């Protein structure tokens, strides 16, 4: 009511969250957006966490909504594949190198390409949907994937 906030996390909760978040900072900070420029994992952390959490929750909602009335294969894609393709299609686009450089230095959102190629490799259901294996370019070993919640 009065805008008063109280910290309900324990010190251990905060420490664990910081450690788990650092996995995402490091992952995104190692993405080469241009040959001479890496993404800024610190700058984009909040939005990357939001994308990750949103994907996890929306996928659970999708599975819940379709459990009693399963969807079939359409155009050769399973419902689970279509879920992830729909997410990816939102971020499709072309962008000039100058704008990549500008946004990477100033925007707290990852570039569209990395909101897909950086987010999906941390979602176990994406691996299952597409049968992603170690030989696939976006594969991230399970122990290196972000697990926040």
What function would you assign to each model-found segment?
Residues 1-149:
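Zinc-dependent metallohydrolase catalytic domains
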């Amino acid at each position: 009511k009065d805008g008063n906030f109280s910290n309900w996390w324990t010190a251990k909760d905060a420490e664990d969250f910081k450690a788990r978040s650092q996995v995402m900072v490091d992952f995104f900070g190692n993405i080469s957006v241009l040959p001479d420029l890496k993404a800024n994992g610190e700058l984009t952390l909040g939005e990357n966490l939001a994308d990750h959490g949103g994907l996890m929750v929306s996928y659970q909602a999708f599975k819940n909504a379709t459990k009693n009335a399963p969807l079939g294969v359409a155009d050769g894609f399973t419902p689970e594949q279509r879920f992830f393709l729909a997410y990816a299609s939102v971020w499709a686009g072309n962008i000039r190198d100058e704008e990549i450089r500008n946004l990477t230095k100033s925007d707290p959102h990852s570039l569209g390409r990395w909101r897909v190629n950086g987010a999906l490799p941390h979602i176990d259901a994406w691996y299952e949907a597409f049968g992603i294996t170690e030989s696939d370019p976006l594969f991230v070993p399970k122990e290196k994937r972000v697990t926040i919640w």
